[in-house]
Amino acid sequence: MKSSKFTSTPLFPRQALVALLLPLIAEQALSVTIGLADTLMVSSVGEAAVSGVSLVDSFNTLMIQIMSALATGGAVVTSQNIGHQEPKNAKAAAAQILFVLSSFSVLVAAVVIGGRHAILRGIFGSIDADVMRYAETYFLLSALSYPFIGLYNAGAALFRAQGNSKISMLSSLVMNVVNIGGNAVLIYGFGMGVMGAALASLVSRAIACAVVLYLLQKPGCALRVDSLRAMAPNGGLIRRILRVGIPAGIENGMFQIGKLSVSSLTSTLGTAAIAANAVANTTTTFLNIPANAVGMAALTVVGQCLGAGEKEQAVYYSRRLMLTAYCGAWVMNLSAFFFANRFAVSLFNLSPEAQAMALDIMVWFNIVSLFVWPSSFTLPNILRAAGDARFTMTVSIVSMWAFRVGFCYLAVLCFGGGLLSIWMGMYLDWVFRSLCFYLRFRRGSWLEQSVI
């Protein structure tokens, strides 16, 4: 059935979009729960434990973002091949992204396990002995989970590329149930503290990885990868994947390196500031869930539209997705502003000073996010889905070093600013990114990109 909006059959009618988006929103909520559960349960050990976990998680996020970027490259190539009605090439791309992610994650895990102390000292410098002790314990077990995270990200991205977001949602549900149950037993039952939280996360990620890989090799899977032979390196396909994956990986990597630089700056403000920053980061992540989910859906929707040669539909669905992202941002942030911020902060075992810092940050986050978060982070996924990853990389790197890093160091070291000034630098970064991505989208040059 043709729609009056298009000259051809719509690729994603309302029911298909809802079926794609709702599981992604649920998956994002479940994913964020792992970080919240760890921080909440570890907070019972004290601020030093929260700080140690927070510092390591900032590095973990760097690794996870790079692996997610590589998975994004595979998802874009696979989505465009699906839209172009080339199932054989789509399956081949699926196998290659598993090869790329498994190789990368094992290599990174080996480096971190061998050099975790030097990495922590190099990034964060001189921190309290208790914080360092907790951080080293958490870092070791986190590194062991990297291969599971990499393969899980690859498998989940491939299911989303097919338009099947229920699989990644269900595997995320399993991961969270195991993680929270493990936290309860190991932290409260056996008194293992930070080590218990890290072990629970490791086991939960391994199980989620096993579930996704099992489903990916089942006969009914459209992107079935049923043997190690299928994962033999294919230079041509790897180059196509990396054409999106490398710029996205550099972008995400540099973005997280910038955040690590700022975390290093935050660590000079004292344990209360580190703890407040950790809690604010964890709680505000919940507010981005709808817009993040829309960004993930955009890789599938826009990728398949452009693979099918339907530029008109790509533009239409992009606008529709952005409207959805903004609606989600307004609902979440206004709800937090009026009802949830103070309650969320009270859940953590923070000093009065740290609580006050966290509340100030969260209020400003609510206000700024209403206007620029979706265009800063959801919109670039639309451009990446077209293969326009170099532009998003360039804008993100320039903006991050100029505002998120440059402004923050200037504000703190030269003008004596505190934790709030660091977050203000981040908001300036969002505004600049939003403007650049909006202009790129409006001019339409992203529609001329292709990765197949």
Predicted regions and their residues:
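Short alpha-helical transmembrane segments in multi-pass integral membrane proteins
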Residues: 1-24, 78-145, 189-246, 302-369, ...
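Residue-level signal for short hydrophobic patches within transmembrane helices
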Residues: 14-33, 37, 59-66, 144, ...
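Transmembrane helical elements of multi-pass membrane transporters/channels
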Residues: 19-35, 141, 175, 204-208, ...
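Helix-terminus/linker motif at the lipid-water interface of multi-pass membrane proteins
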Residues: 29-51, 120-129, 185-192, 253-286, ...
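Small-residue hotspots at the loop-to-helix junctions and early N-terminal turns
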Residues: 47-58, 135, 139, 198, ...
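Small-residue-rich hydrophobic transmembrane alpha-helices
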Residues: 50-110, 149-168, 274-340, 373-396
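Hydrophobic transmembrane alpha-helices of multi-pass small-molecule transporters
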Residues: 62-65, 179-183, 209-213, 286-289, ...
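Short runs within selected transmembrane alpha-helices of multi-pass transporters and secretion channels
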Residues: 71, 141-160, 168-176, 197-212, ...
